[in-house]
Structure formats: C-alpha cells, structure tokens
Amino acid sequence: LNVCSLWRGGTHGGWGAVSGLPDVDPALGYYDDGLPEVADWEIKFMVENGIDIEHFCWFAPADNQIEPIKRSGLGFALHDGYFNAKYSDLMKFTFMWENSKVNTTNLEDFKKYIWSYWMDYYFLDDRFYTTENKLVFTVWSWQNFKEAFGGTNEGANEAVAFMNEDAKAHGFDGILLFFADGSAADPSSFTAMANLGASGAYAYHWGQAGNNADETIYRLKGNSSYDKLYIVPAVSVGFNDIGWSNIRKPLISTDDHKKVLEFIKNDYLPQQTG
C-alpha cells in the first residue's frame, strides 16, 4: 500500500486544509504521524484487510546529499511510528525514493550518503520487504534517477549494478528496482525505464481516472502489452484533493474497486511470467 506520510502537526501542510470537510475526516481523527499508537492502529486496519506491505515515501534531507544523513525528510511515520509500533512485525515495509529534487550528482556520493543510510536503517531490518531474498524498493522519477548518475543509461546501469553487488555482499540475492511510471502510456517511456536497469514499473496512482474500473483495466492491459518490462498492477481509487483544489471529486465505488481486484486476480496475474 502506497502511503505519503504528511500528517504531523507543524510539518508540511498539516490538517488545516481538510479540517472543515467532514466527508474526508480520517478514521483515526486528526492524528500525528510518528506516534507508535497511530502506527499500530494503521497496521491493524491493513492486516485485517489483507494488506501486508507498507510502501512509504522516502525524502532525502537535502536536494544534493553531500554529508551523512542524520534524519530523512518527513520520516516520522516510519522512524518514530512503525519502527516503534508493538505490532510492526505483522507486516513488511519498503520505500519509494521520492527523488523529485534528484538528491545526488554522482555514484560515489550516492554510495556514501544515501545507499549506506538505506542499508543501515532499512535493508538490514528484518521487517524490510524482500522477495526471493532480493531487496524490493521503488523510485519516483526515472528521469531524475538517470540525471543523478550522469544523465546516461550507462551511468544508471552502473548504479544498479553496484546496488546488486552490495546487496549480495550483505547476504541478499540482489535488488528489484521499480520506477513509478509518471502516468506514461507509451512504449518509449517503458523502454527507457528498462534501459536504466529497472525490474519493472508501476503507477503511483491513476489520478482521477482511478475511480473508473474500466479505465484502470484498460491502462493495465495497454502498458503490459508493450512487453518492455514487468508492470505492477496498481489499484487506485481516484484523487479527491478537495482540501487543496476546492473541487470535490468522486472516489471509486466498492463495486468498481472489487471489479479491478478481481480482474487482477483472475485475468492479469495468471498471464504474467518471469
């Protein structure tokens, strides 16, 4: 489950934008990310509904990280909440490198300041998500990933090769790296992601179109049909950002949500290989 943990008083926008809108009141009330009790309630809600992996946004503290990281940006929900939650062992976690600011300009700085932090704080934690003993994580912008390592496919592939090698040096069998697709729906974008060494791509969400089951199914079929790399079957609900846009937008119905899930279970996944 993708989560962007922006909900702590005094950080980011806080609750002010939505506090006058009872139809979007959170089930937990106006909570603070970072409280272990909040994390435990979230874990309870998720595991009771079949969700076993929480996918946090990870923000580097600097636009260009050239010193050791003491604390990642907006990391309260993961570091103070989930890590200290009583029931955190009931589900796994991973992260999306939210690299909209690129965060590094070369592989050596990435190794020294970002990758080493991930290894120490996340990858070696027993709760970190792996499959087939491979570390699984994602990146927000494939274009910025490429820019971070010299702006070339060769530079990006060198970085991915390093990640695989270092993961193996720490007892894993490599990495699985997925790029958010940035709403791409063309084969050239997915070819570009594959050329950077990605294991696959996924939709962070489907935007407002995510409230329509047929549109979601159409996009999944289309992106997968290009056969450039594996497409993770994302399930979205729409994008009701009324607190910021002042426009109320409908979310997906339970029937349409079920329709997408059943399509993925019964049609999409059985056709996947590799």
Which positions does each model-derived feature cover?
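Glycan-processing catalytic domains of CAZymes
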Residues: 1-274
